């Protein structure tokens, strides 16, 4: 592609690009004609440009498409690059190809002989630690399976699973940052291993935090540290909260904050109004090597934190634990606690004393309480009047209305900013499915990947890398492949719909499309305990999005043709039984 001013002109070869093969590719421009050559033969030309090339001041990049917010790398290797200050003739290109042909051997890769329809779920990839990834898939009946994988499409590594089972998972070790991992599932069929369509996962989207459980404590193992460690264990066991943001309200010298951070992926903010305590806490946590990354200590008045509303997944108090007093202001504690499940975990007094801390305060109306051992847990209720956006156009009825009764245009403020960002997304012109939100969860679909996030603070709770079959674009003429309820996300991919737990991402169930012939799952919605679907002909979905031909903003048939279902059905979303 090039420009002589204004828009870019793209030149495509008339031959298809296949991974696992070497190509000699040449592009030339002589001031009036663009040409592209493949293996010594001209495969395309364009005369729409005249004059000198308009060189951009941006970085010159080979091997990918890169701009301010997009990155599409080549799937393969580049052996050699040559740049000329003149346009080569067709004969010169052919001569150059003849001198280099045969220099490279094509690397073998597993043959693709069956499609992913042979699976009852997956495959999909999740990063479980900074150095490991997990690939999951399910088969309709128990069978041994294999996984071929590697950092190139040649899939040079093999993992065999001899056990006959339906649910399969394989750990990929040695994950490196900034790498693309290719993998393919092999299933036993007719006495042979048959390989499925390869998929990829990018470690740029590995958000796993390092395990810091083995770091040496910067605190003496005195009674206060032992009490803090025991309290952290009890709080985590009772709440199950291991990701997000935690507040230590009256944090003392940071012992409880350290104990929580070292056992979880939480980011812990400790606040104290004592300058000496803040200084000692920071010094200790710096010695441990986690200050500023996992724990931060703030010296400020407890009655006026200055933190945004509805932020924290967990709130505790070292001051209460060790001295029997809950400092600060109950109104402020409730204000910063995350709605729909944020937990204030109280410890340090008998249950009767802990209950008095709640009685007569705003915490009574804003939370529900329960006893767990020596703890009193106050869980914040959902926001009264809060809306949700569970389908592409708001609701299953496509009302384009969230039902929110809280928003006031004169009082809006930034809640959070951060990941996932633009890197893993499809460009806006492709019009892929929009984010959904319900009950404090936010679901974002990118290019063959989905993130599950905390809607109140942006924490990435889980994310999956999917095969290219997930992609759905031009939704005004096709439709989204996602919908949500108050606890889960439904995703249509290929011939199935998947239900993932909103908090953990765990696969709860997969639902096969209902059709009398081969079909993909098209329309998807849920309401009143039912999951609705429509079957479409395989391959009828819009999936292409790279380049101006796929901005879907023209009035031609390519952009405006509607994808229609062949049928409509309803399934009980709990049991999976067809209702009609």
Predicted regions and their residues:
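A short acidic, Gly/Pro-enriched loop at the edge of an enzyme's catalytic core
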Residues: 303-314
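Conserved class I S-adenosyl-L-methionine
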Residues: 241-258, 267-269
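Repeat-blade elements of multi-bladed beta-propeller folds
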Residues: 59, 427-450, 473-498, 515-568
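Beta-strand-rich domains and repeat architectures in extracellular enzymes and scaffolds
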Residues: 394-403, 407-449, 480
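Short, surface-exposed linear motifs at loops/turns and structural transition points
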Residues: 109-208
